[in-house]
């Protein structure tokens, strides 16, 4: 999402957007092509670690995530998906993530939301969730974050947050003088 998606010759794009994005067509084609190639590389990586586990028993966990949608998302996304500015912030700052292991994880239920079908969490929550799923010890701070995740799984740098039910709000800061 930080890339300059106009670097390659357009003939190298392996994916072409079905939707007309106007001035952003070439950008979308390269961005989507990068996603397609990344997907194939991740599959190759997972296949490699699966084979390593079968040969050696070495356990590996892979976590992949982004910290926000690409910078051009505001030009190509349909804003009607968000009812409020807070919800739009959450959507724009959300990206898919996954945690994969080449062996069974024992604590996966703790990482799954029972109220949010998209199972969203922010980047701060990813590390303690990964450690928890791996069955590794957690610091007091990570324990605190996991407890917080039960009520507020997403907090953005723009002070927007998402409650466990998927509703969004904005944190209001007041100055000492306003008290």
Predicted regions and their residues:
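Solvent-exposed soluble domains appended to multi-pass membrane proteins
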Residues: 1-179
């Amino acid at each position: 999402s930080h890339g300059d998606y106009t670097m390659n010759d357009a003939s190298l794009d392996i994916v072409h957007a079905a939707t007309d994005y106007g001035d952003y067509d070439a950008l979308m084609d390269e961005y989507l092509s990068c996603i397609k190639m990344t997907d194939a590389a991740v599959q190759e990586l997972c296949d490699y670690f699966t084979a390593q586990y079968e040969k050696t028993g070495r356990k590996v966990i892979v976590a992949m995530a982004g910290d926000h949608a690409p910078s051009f998302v505001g030009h190509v996304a349909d804003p009607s998906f968000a009812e409020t500015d807070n919800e739009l912030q959450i959507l724009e700052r959300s990206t898919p993530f996954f945690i994969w292991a080449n062996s069974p994880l024992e604590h996966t239920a703790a990482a799954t939301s029972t109220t949010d079908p998209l199972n969203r969490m922010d980047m701060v929550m990813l590390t303690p969730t990964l450690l928890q799923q791996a069955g590794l010890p957690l610091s007091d701070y990570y324990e605190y974050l996991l407890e917080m995740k039960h009520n507020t799984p997403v907090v953005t740098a723009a002070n927007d947050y998402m409650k466990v039910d998927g509703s969004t709000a904005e944190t209001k800061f007041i100055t000492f003088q306003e008290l």
